[in-house]
Structure formats: structure tokens, C-alpha cells
Amino acid sequence: MIRRPPRSTQGVSSAASDVYKRQVLEYLIQRGFMSHIIYEPVKQRLQRSELAVPGSNPKMFEKALKSSADYVFLDLEDAVAPDDKVPARKNIIEAINDLDWNGNGKTISVRINSIDTHYMYRDVVEVVEQAGDKLDTILLPKAGTASDVYMLSAMLNQIETSKGLKNRIGIEVLIETTLGMANVMDIAQKGREERLEAMHFGVADYAASCRARTTVIGGLNPDYPGDQWHAGLSQMLVACRAYGIRAIDGPFGDFNDPESYIDAAKRGAALGFEGKWAIHPSQIDLANEVYTPPESEVSHAKQILIALDEAAKEGRGAAQLNGRMIDAASAKMAENIVNTDNAITSKLKG
């Protein structure tokens, strides 16, 4: 049911107006009156490499800060034993407040415990109340439905308002169960309106949820003809791109096998992912290298944009470059490459 806002716009928030417009558009799409709607990217963050750091090991915080990782999440979930959950929470709050993550070119996040645990509530309340003004995102594990995202978003709304926080914390989710994968499109669509910025492929728990036979977390099974994770990765990627959400590939368990890590990262990059987890510092530079566009690719992308700009001035929608036809679709791909390169350059300049 579409809820139309009052005819008078006085006192009506822009958010309410935007929701109404989206409801109308989706109503028209569902009934075949419109072919598509474009969701612009919700937020750009450089996320080529994503370093996981146990909250129970504060000695690793300073090393993570000085690393070349684009993104660091301090973990309260799988990497922390039950008896260490409470002290790990305290460690993480101190690390967020005392260390200059953004100043060192990092997006800083916290992976909380899942909503089916008794830890989750205190994770959110204590971390956000005490360090929310310096926290970029919260990573929610085992998201199964869009309601999971709504619950976390509602908690953040209340805490930020009660504490007067000016920083709006983003939400990222791990798709790591068959339920989450079955609902991935709905999670992306509805979650976007509830702070959702990114989805991560949690291959280890996803494998367990599928009862898949695996050898290495994120690795290939020699008995399977091809990449057994391709279907899940592709399904999640499409949901992300449909609704302007960032898509991040998950972990590769054997940090003593850099070649296989690179192969996995290249497969993700080829599909359209923006980055990959690093569960060990040795994997950071591998991810950065794979997800950094080569100079030749950046140069070619800029040439495409210049050629199409010149064609547009002449009233043409397409152009030729090096004997090949390029058009609006070429421009979109080129813009993605140039935007990523600009973000990397900006980070390096500090």
C-alpha cells in the first residue's frame, strides 16, 4: 500500500517525501508501467582490502592502524572466545577513541555478534554510546532477512539521537547463510533505506549452511568442476549493484598460499567486487594489487570519457576509439575505473 504524504509539504520531511516517491516508482514498475529505476551508489568508500582484527588482541590494533589496509574491522564475533567478549568490547572502544583511523586512511568498523546472541545488544549500545562519533560502520554478521537490518538501524537511530551524535554510522552485512542468500535481494532493497552500505560474502559460514564439502575457506574443491562459490557471489553482487550497495568478497583461509588468494581475488574482481577480506596482514597488499586498476586501464578509461565527451558535443551518442565502438555503457564502466583510481590517489595523498 502506498502512503501518500499530506498535500501540503509543510512539516513533511524530505525523507518521507523520498519514501513516497520510491513507493510510487516501485508500484509503477511492478505493474509494468516503467521498465526500471536507477539506484545511485549509496556511499563510496575505498574497500580493496579489509583487515580483520580480533578485539581480544589489542596488540594488533596499532599494527592494523599502520598497515596498508583500506578498511579495518575490529571483531567481537567469531575471532573472540565467549569469556573474552566483554573485555574485547572495552578494548575496541578504547581503540576507536584513541587511534586516528580516518587520519591514517582507514575506514573503521566493528563486527558485532549476531542478533540471535545475548551479546549483540550490549555490543551496539556500549560501542556506539562510547565511541560512535568516531565509528564509520557496523558489520552485522549472519543477516538473514531485511528485518535484521531494520533492527540494527532502529537501535542506531535511538542511540545517536539520545547521545546527540552527529556522525551517522553506516551498516554493512555479512551474507553467510542460505536464508540470507535466499533473501539477498530483499535485504539490499529494504536495507538501503536503513543505512545499508555494503554486503560481504561470508564464505565459511555459507559453506556450512549449504553443507558444502570444502578444503580451504574460500578455496576451490577439486571435485567441483569450476568455482563452487560463483553462484552465491554472483547472486549477491547483482543485489548489491541493483540497489547501489558495495559488494565485498570474503576471506580466504590459507594465508600461506598467496597464489590461491590472488586467484580468488581476481575471480571476485572480474565479477565486479570492490575488495576482499584479509585475515592476515600478508594478504593486504595482495588484495590492494588485484583491486587497483592498472595504469593502462585507467588511461584507457580516461580516453573513453574524452572521446565520448567530444562525440556528445557533435551530437553523437557513440564514438570510435582504437577501431572499437564505445557508447554510454562504455562510459559507465570507464567512470567506475576512474572513480576508483581517484579514491586511491586521494588516500595516498593523505
Language model features with spans:
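Single conserved hydrophobic/aromatic residue that forms the stacking wall/gate
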Residues: 1-23
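Expand to "…catalyze enediolate/carbanion chemistry for C-C bond making/breaking, isomerization
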Residues: 25-350
